[in-house]
């Protein structure tokens, strides 16, 4: 695959990670009042208008039915489980801690992209990913007690679901349109989560309307970015840039919840950024070699 395509996909992924961090902060705020399943439903329902507008603008309704239904349905189910378990983690853990545990996903994506997708993962990528994961461990300083709680296990389950979702995107991207990937994911996520949320549904507070709308917008834009990145770039090259969300989570924890990172968190964050910059540099060198 062209290194230029990988570099473009990496830039899109970095932007998507920032948007998703904003969305996750909004969901954490909502989770203090609403049940996890309802937060999941509100996130997907708020994104529906943006998705439908996008599909209409692209005039892609015909492509909506020409899809590989089994994989889309599987991805929809995985998405519901992924978001619900992630919200459970957000409710009980700090945003930065939640992200730290979740960042096992890029390593899982890279590992599974070899046997499932047949991608080649060179030594440099493994080193960069391993280095980034080391930074995550420094931030978390896991002793076992912090990870193996219900909230910690929920985030690990969410990361595993995200891993399979990313791989399914790559498989579907070979035959299905980008619009169909987004349309059916959000539609199935909204339908499934709303159905399960109805028994415990709480009235929407007026003061939460702006927050729900913001979650919908950032969720749509972030989903577009992730779908684009995994569809047009190599999964194993894109996955490490999930780590950049850590930087945004540190800032939002300080801004909203008044929690400051300690020196271990700062050291770990520096390592994570360094591993990402190393891969960006590597992809750029390859791109220049292909197009002198």
Predicted regions and their residues:
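Helix-helix packing/entry segments at the starts of transmembrane helices
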Residues: 42, 99-104, 172-185, 224-254
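Hydrophobic/small/kink-forming positions within alpha-helical transmembrane segments
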Residues: 17-22, 52, 76, 80-84, ...
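Loop-to-transmembrane-helix transition segments
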Residues: 8-16, 55-56, 61-85, 150-158, ...
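Transmembrane alpha-helical segments that form core, pore/gating elements
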Residues: 25-28, 36-37, 51, 145-204, ...
């Amino acid at each position: 695959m062209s290194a230029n395509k990988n570099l473009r996909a990496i830039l899109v992924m970095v932007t998507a990670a920032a948007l998703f961090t904003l969305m996750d902060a909004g969901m954490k705020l909502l989770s203090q009042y609403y049940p996890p399943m309802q937060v999941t439903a509100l996130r997907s329902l708020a994104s529906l208008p943006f998705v439908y507008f996008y599909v209409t603008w692209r005039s892609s309704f015909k492509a909506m039915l020409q899809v590989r239904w089994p994989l889309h349905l599987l991805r929809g189910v995985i998405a519901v489980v992924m978001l619900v378990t992630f919200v459970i983690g957000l409710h009980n853990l700090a945003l930065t801690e939640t992200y730290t545990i979740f960042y096992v996903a890029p390593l899982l994506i890279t590992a599974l992209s070899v046997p499932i997708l047949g991608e080649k993962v060179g030594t440099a990528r493994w080193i960069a990913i391993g280095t980034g994961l080391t930074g995550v461990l420094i931030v978390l300083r896991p002793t076992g007690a912090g990870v193996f709680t219900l909230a910690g296990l929920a985030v690990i389950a969410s990361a595993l679901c995200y891993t399979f979702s990313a791989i399914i995107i790559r498989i579907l991207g070979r035959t299905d349109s980008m619009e169909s990937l987004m349309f059916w994911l959000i539609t199935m996520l909204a339908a499934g989560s709303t159905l399960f949320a109805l028994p415990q549904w709480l009235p929407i507070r007026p003061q939460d309307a702006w927050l729900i709308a913001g979650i919908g917008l950032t969720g749509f834009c972030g989903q577009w970015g992730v779908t684009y990145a995994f569809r047009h770039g190599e999964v194993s090259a894109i996955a490490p840039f999930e780590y950049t969300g850590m930087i945004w989570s540190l800032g939002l924890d300080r801004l909203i919840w008044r929690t400051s990172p300690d020196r271990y968190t700062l050291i770990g964050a520096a390592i994570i950024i360094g591993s990402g910059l190393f891969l960006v540099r590597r992809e750029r060198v390859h791109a220049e070699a292909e197009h002198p």
